Amino acid sequence: MAGGTVKYRHLSRNSAARVALLRGLVTQLVQFEHIHTTYAKAKEAQRMAEKLITLAKRDNEPGRRSAQGILYTPTTTLPKLLGELRNRYLTREGGYTRVVRTESKNTYDQGESAILEFVDGPKDSRFMMTAKTVARDRMLGQEHTPVTRTNIKKVTQFRGEVPFEEM
């Protein structure tokens, strides 16, 4: 292939359609805090979402205008981005989103599916899975495995122990 490595996934679309798709995915991510899509689309939207949160954390007019240009419905999603999401990730250096591979959502093509979500949010799947495992271990009277202890440490790092004990 001429030109060296590929810098992004083309997603079988031309440039305008690809940008429109990614803007739509990121807008839905900000609105609902998690989306279910294909793995390739999730990884590309993750890049744009990380940049969007970084723009929101700067809290200046150029960053606000750039974020407004990315989001499709800025009147509803920009206040959430600049308020709730910005405050949630002020102390975090990066890694605001997570891509979790899931079973294929389409039975006819078996394409790779994934969930793109914000970390430390109310719909955080790692937090829910860890809480479920801890509840099962407590009910059975078993010790936590090393993987479970690591996951407990990760999900409570920025969230604190209180929400985990409430589950």
Can you say where each PLM-predicted feature lies in the sequence?
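Structured, basic alpha/beta domains of bacterial-type, RNA-associated proteins
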Residues: 2-10, 24, 28-31, 35-167
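Basic, ligand-binding patches in group-transfer machinery
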Residues: 21
